[in-house]
Amino acid sequence: MGAAVAALAAPLLLAAANLAVPPRSELNRPWPFFTAEEPEEPPLRAPIDALNSFAMPPGYAVELVAAEPLVQDPILMEFDGDGRLWVMELPGWAHNLSMENSLEPVNRLVVLDDTDNDGVFDNRTVFADKLVLPRAFKILAGGCALIGEPPTLWKACDTDRDLKADTKEKVADGFARLGVLEHGANGLFWGMDNLLVVSEHEWNVAYKAGQFATVPGLRRGQWGVTQDDAGRIYRNVNTDPLFVDYVSPDYYARNPDLVRTRGLYENLVDQEKTNIWPAHPTFGLNRGYRREVFRADGTASYYGGVSSPLIYRGTRLPADVQGMGFVADGATNIVHLLRLKDDGQGRMAAEDFYAKGEFLASTDVRFRPTALAGGPDGSFYVADMYRGVSQDGPLQTDYLRDYITKRGLARGIGHGRIYRVVHVSANGAAAPMPRDARPQMSRDTTAALVAHLSHPNGWWRDTAQQHLVQRADPKSEPLLVKLAKDLKADWRSRLHALWTLDGMGAMRADLALLAMRDAKAELRAAGLRLAESSLAKGDQKLIKAVLTLAGDGNWQVRLQAAATLGALPDAARTQPMIALLSVHGDDPVLVDAALSGLKGNELPVLTALAAARAAPREAVAMLAGALAKRRDAATGQQLVALAARDDLPAPVRTALLDGLALGFAGGAQTGGNAVAGGRAGGNIPGVSRQRGGGNRFELPADPRSLAVLAAGKDALAEPAKKLLALVTWPGRPAPPALPPRSASEEALFRRGQSIYVEQCSGCHQVQGQGQATVAPPLAGSKRVAANGDVPVRILTNGLEGKIGLMPPLGSAMNDEEVAAVLTYVRQSWGNTGTPLPPAAVKEWRLAFAHRTTPGSEKDIDAPQR
């Protein structure tokens, strides 16, 4: 740490040194706490004073462990294997009074250290600087780190052990693009299966034999990734606090013909039953002008912008919060706690932990929790960017921008705080749960690292696994095998041992088989995944075990078996799939997991299921959808004929018609707790490769039976009409074709496609089908194809519609970018609007520049004179 920084930090550090514990928030303050005070210009609070703004449930407090200038503008953090805290600092975000993001290389990755082990960080080293709007980082063994700096994923290393990177190599291109910060690739979370999970992006990162490589995934989540003890991945998005992946994304990526991906990114929280309880009025939100959605005291009742989920797996807080979910909501100055529930079968749900009141709420509008991270001491930490602004400028409504300006909230950058969450006894003494000793994993022996896999604190287990995989010491293998086989060991330790062996390329079929026969469901499910490399080789013992587990009494084991069946040799796959789906084919999550492994084998499975006495409608519809999406003419004709057979039960025929329509339209379907394609920009594999325009699927012959159904008056008529509108055949008049685009219009269209996928598909979906309660469909939208002023006004001024707020995303785009993305949506998915030239966009923007709030649907639809 430089002398100037040290001098500035001295008062804070001396204050900490004179106390038995680091500076701490007030214990047992009245809770829930609320103040109606709303200063016209909220003051900047010194770090010590900011502690007085917090209210927590009885027994809880936060300790101040770092503050400016030691840390500034923190957005991400992670502890390394030696107990140092790495922090991504983003001073370039909203860096001026106009709240613009700087494209100058002013951001950095720093390392904080507590050199005297008093619980307060006192040293700062800049590992990497001169970064342009970085979105992610991941600490690696050997003094290295992955850094996501759009559009590049870098690996930077410190080769002389001074904690300063002196080498940098490119790992991959295409890691997001410079644009709206909250919709950029992030995460790089090292999961139990050794896959580095990336949120808001279409690929993840795999580590094999010392090398990193991108692997196909599905775009999910928005900001942050976490996992539970079983290795299930959790994410969140915008105003929805927690989603879970029951199935790994690589399964769905293997079949581009899927029309749905249930089991991936399942919503755990009922929006109608969850509430937040801020400690002060929260009108400083994008929709703060809609006072009717606030409580009488001025507080929002629903999340303003969640991020950084954390499943707490530490040991220093009480048992009732271990395994529970924490989420930050910087927009409303809270950290919310969710109670996770497992129904005993692996199906998860989440609800508010407290009926009223927040786990952590601040009366300071500048408390902006951006990241939560478990620590080696058994507690967890909160990074506070300490800014008056929390909404990315391009997404701000005019109301919010005016609110920020009037209150001076854009002033005061360069601050930042890190807090440790603690639990204390009634008299304020330290809780009986001591902090874990500081780790030294970079210097630990291989045997010591293996021993850490049995640590009760999940941080130690995760970090030790990562070090062992990267170290790849052959001496660890017998120790790991011994632990994996130890039936008396904690199941979590055995699970880590198995995945560590797999990450080292040392997984054995006998170990997978042992896990598949275990009494613990989590181990049986893991054993199925770990067996897959041997299944393709025809290992009969493993194949038999997999078929047995397809009938397991536990849902999560059956679900994994459904996905794993896809790893069987083709000849051995069809009959087990038929058997499984005949019994469980109305479970949408299991159906999609099974179909992910059926590419090329859907037709015989569908034929068998449709002929069954009690055909499972869910499986029938999704199989028909996958086959239709493949767009094979002969198969399409065959399936239309199948749906027209009057000897099949009407529900089965309806399922066939619905599935075919979904597939011909390109997917994707929502339902249940799923968010189709993922709330934040999820693409179902292959969907983005569908052609734009109104191209109907061409059948080889006139489907007269379908026309008969469509002309009927029973329940089959409507789905038949819907399907009939999506197909054509020789002799049927073609729909009006779009005029050819000029070279400049084509360039505009292509550029718009890129912008749309990056910034719009999160809500409206890749195929423009929209999402219920989130965003309306753009495919077939009259407003999209209306006179140019309508879509321009919606994109640049925003729209307050029946579903909710469309933010003025286009306000941060130049005229050409607005023209490009609108040209793309106006000429895709059957839309027939004309291209929009940048000059027209400029004209309409100027005409409606006086608007200060998003327009209403009535305003937008009113004719302009």
Q: What residue ranges belong to the model's regions?
A:
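Bacterial N-terminal signal peptides
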Residues: 2-15
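Beta-propeller domains with acidic blade repeats across secreted/periplasmic ectodomains
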Residues: 17-448, 459, 469, 543
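Flexible coil segments in periplasmic/lumen-exposed cytochrome c-class electron-transfer proteins
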Residues: 22-41, 679-680, 734-746, 808-809, ...
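Short beta-alpha connecting loops at secondary-structure transitions
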Residues: 209-210, 356-357, 398-406, 563, ...
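The canonical Cys-X-X-Cys-His
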Residues: 372, 383, 418-421, 752-766, ...
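Long, ordered, helix-rich scaffold segments
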Residues: 383, 408-414, 422-754, 837, ...
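Sequence/structural segment immediately N-terminal to covalent heme-attachment motifs in c-type
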Residues: 745-769, 783-797
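Electron-transfer interface patches adjacent to heme c in soluble/periplasmic c-type cytochromes
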Residues: 777-793, 797, 801-819, 827-832
